[in-house]
Amino acid sequence: MAKLKMKSTVIEQKMIADGICSMWLDAKEIAVQAKPGQFISVYSNDKSRVLPRPISICEIDREKGTLRIVYRVVGKGTEEFSKAEAGDSFEILGPLGNGFPIEEAKGKKVLMIGGGIGV
């Protein structure tokens, strides 16, 4: 599975709780490869913030080629993301991480621990 860096367009963005945002991104090449448990790195458009923000993929729609990320606004980078509107774009890198081996876990008890906001 190849990591891809691409420009991704915001399809929809909304605040779903105090300081928690949900964003759908158009990312066909990443969406077709992504597995549960993986994440993307989202790059700020403000060039003063060099490091991307790692954000878990919350939902994948392979047919539409879209990804949903849910994140907490905690600093300048995620604050910038929270102000994005449909049609805005960000560079993203992904899919990253090993994901969850869903097929291997069928019929077994599994313990999962989430970090961040638990998505």
Task: Locate each region found by the language model.
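Ferredoxin-reductase
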Residues: 2-86
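FNR/FR-type flavoprotein reductase catalytic core
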Residues: 76-119
